[in-house]
Amino acid sequence: MTILNHTLGFPRVGLRRELKKAQESYWAGNSTREELLAVGRELRARHWDQQKQAGIDLLPVGDFAWYDHVLTTSLLLGNVPARHQNKDGSVDIDTLFRIGRGRAPTGEPAAAAEMTKWFNTNYHYMVPEFVKGQQFKLTWTQLLEEVDEALALGHKVKPVLLGPVTYLWLGKVKGEQFDRLSLLNDILPVYQQVLAELAKRGIEWVQIDEPALVLELPQAWLDAYKPAYDALQGQVKLLLTTYFEGVTPNLDTITALPVQGLHVDLVHGKDDVAELHKRLPSDWLLSAGLINGRNVWRADLTEKYAQIKDIVGKRDLWVASSCSLLHSPIDLSVETRLDAEVKSWFAFALQKCHELALLRDVLNSGDTAALAEWSAPIQARRHSTRVHNPAVEKRLAAITAQDSQRTNVYEVRAEAQRARFKLPAWPTTTIGSFPQTTEIRTLRLDFKKGNLDANNYRTGIAEHIKQAIVEQERLGLDVLVHGEAERNDMVEYFGEHLDGFVFTQNGWVQSYGSRCVKPPIVIGDVSRPAPITVEWAKYAQSLTDKPVKGMLTGPVTILCWSFPREDVSRETIAKQIALALRDEVADLEAAGIGIIQIDEPALREGLPLRRSDWDAYLQWGVEAFRINAAVAKDDTQIHTHMCYCEFNDIMDSIAALDADVITIETSRSDMELLESFEEFDYPNEIGPGVYDIHSPNVPSVEWIEALLKKAAKRIPAERLWVNPDCGLKTRGWPETRAALANMVQAAQNLRRG
């Protein structure tokens, strides 16, 4: 029984973000479709070769996506919303981009599909839309073409396919309501057709991803798995693949399925290997997800070996990444600025492939000498002074309940804030960032590279802040922002100014479509050596009589959007960050900033996948926010912002944040999210987003007015704010001006009644 290794997927974007650049060039009309497709082919070939050279036995094919892999699956199944369909029913790459970006075939605006987080990661997918009586057919053969590509290059491949039950689970019904699970029998023939095509190509194993199996699914959904997989059996061997949590609670359902193997995440799940071995059919292959695909830390291979060694030789066994390596940066070797000590603690996607090769070799040979050598830096890290700060640990231990309480309740604070700011009805504001123009990016890059001195850099940033204030005053906005010209990323910027973080040069991971992020890495205890945002907030406020918001990223979001330490709890990291940012709130307030926004877009996405684990997470997540904010005086207005959230199941916790104003993303869901706030009778103020910033479309005054009137039927108008869905960093100035002008006009029309 020779043990093989494999990955569940590999980063798509390229070491230098080649995919992003090719996509954006194509969207801008600066390159042809064939040039775009050629970049995809080159990246796939390179990534397969890199994995093979690193010692991977079975290469994933079908993990590449032009926007996201769920949208790819929608096209595979012929599931294209009517507003994006070509007249002749054909599907091409432009169809895919229209769904993601919001366009009709005519080029006219057409609402993009809703976007949400992929389970509890920082990756996004376009939510499949289902209508009653929907038809499915194989229309997009990208997977088959890529398998042909890989086979032509001589690779041993394992196609990757999102499973039918998870696909339906991830979608939403549009129009007349019905049970989307009833579509299962309609999509299975397409899956059968795809598997038959793969069998024709001589494929032995197909990785069929069913991550929904780690959730606490309703019984009807669990019951759907058996008939679904009965229909799919027989053409190729199926590796039923789960990740992000353990499978033990649903193991009875899983072991009844006619598949030939099971992949389990042994990093994030609590599954016991011996128990799995005992309960799985003896002829099943077990794929052990031992190497963390979601973090950047070097694996303790001695520990991983001990976890799996007792079942070696007792059943067919593969070793694998816990999930797709999509969530990890590509290659540590190109990071030239990390010092040797810190660098020795990390492993990116390619290094994780090396770890899998090393682990496979040791499991096959029984010679464990190489494991101790690989794991040595991990032992050293446990005692490093760069990891432990006694002052931070002491301050954290001294926190009391009083530290998370504002002085007075919202009603008292609201009165003080109304007296201070005297804002009109339907007050208008934006979420924080303004367009990051080429000039701004060049300015920051030149400064970072040392081509620009600090004085000239500061002069340049000040000019862009001044321009943002002038633009907002010209538009007639009521509460202004400084525009965040100095910030490359809402998390990275804070991480750069906090002790306990390090940064990479090329540690990019895909967020959605062409958007990539470069998450900071928490390597040690977190503290704030000096004020971070005060200088620029104070400068912006000096340029106007209108209030300017101080802008902070909240502790839970900084945690969720960073690569966290693995040696302490997430709660500990969040509260350390909260204490650091608490000092920032106090300093902003002392500098005369009266409105401070603490963004927590990641609060909901940080939820554990199993509802039974939610309460503990929400308790410390809310406490971290309150520790951050509670230092503010009554007449300081605390705002928070949240993105793409389903709120109804966490409304108690949203209210418990006790923010004076919450702004939320609602335009893509047509204000549906406000139902949660209405039913809960949310007591504080709300800014429902009135247009989608992820699309270049400019909303009309009438459209915005209609949304606000809809909102006012649910929330009293005196508690409503008017704002876009999210920050405007990724938009251009022309559409930003046009959209905000219409937004302000809509608010003014409503004030006039």
Curated annotation (Swiss-Prot):
Q: Which Gene3D superfamilies match?
A: 3.20.20.210
Query: Which GO molecular function annotation, any one, does this entry have?
Result: 5-methyltetrahydropteroyltriglutamate-homocysteine S-methyltransferase activity
Question: Active site located where?
Answer: H694 (proton donor)
Q: Which cysteines are joined by disulfide bonds?
A: none
- Residue numbers binding Zn(2+): H641, C643, E665, C726
> So which residues are the signal peptide here?
none
**Which GO BP annotation is one of this protein's?**
methionine biosynthetic process
Q: Which UniProt keywords apply?
A: Amino-acid biosynthesis, Metal-binding, Methionine biosynthesis, Methyltransferase, Repeat, Transferase, Zinc
Catalytic reaction list: 5-methyltetrahydropteroyltri-L-glutamate + L-homocysteine = tetrahydropteroyltri-L-glutamate + L-methionine
What EC identifiers does the entry list?
Answer: 2.1.1.14
Pathway terms, separated by semicolons:
Amino-acid biosynthesis; L-methionine biosynthesis via de novo pathway; L-methionine from L-homocysteine (MetE route): step 1/1
Please tell me where L-homocysteine binds in this chain.
Answer: I431, G432, S433, E484, D599
What positions does the entry give for 5-methyltetrahydropteroyltri-L-glutamate binding? R17, E18, L19, K20, K117, R515, C516, W561, E605
How the cofactor is bound: the record states: Binds 1 zinc ion per subunit.
| Positions of L-methionine binding | I431, G432, S433, E484, D599
Cofactors named for this entry = Zn(2+)
HAMAP family, A to Z: Meth_synth
- Its biological purpose: Catalyzes the transfer of a methyl group from 5-methyltetrahydrofolate to homocysteine resulting in methionine formation.
Q: Which family, according to the similarity comment?
A: Belongs to the vitamin-B12 independent methionine synthase family.
Q: What is this protein called?
A: 5-methyltetrahydropteroyltriglutamate--homocysteine methyltransferase
Taxonomic source organism: Escherichia coli O6:K15:H31 (strain 536 / UPEC)
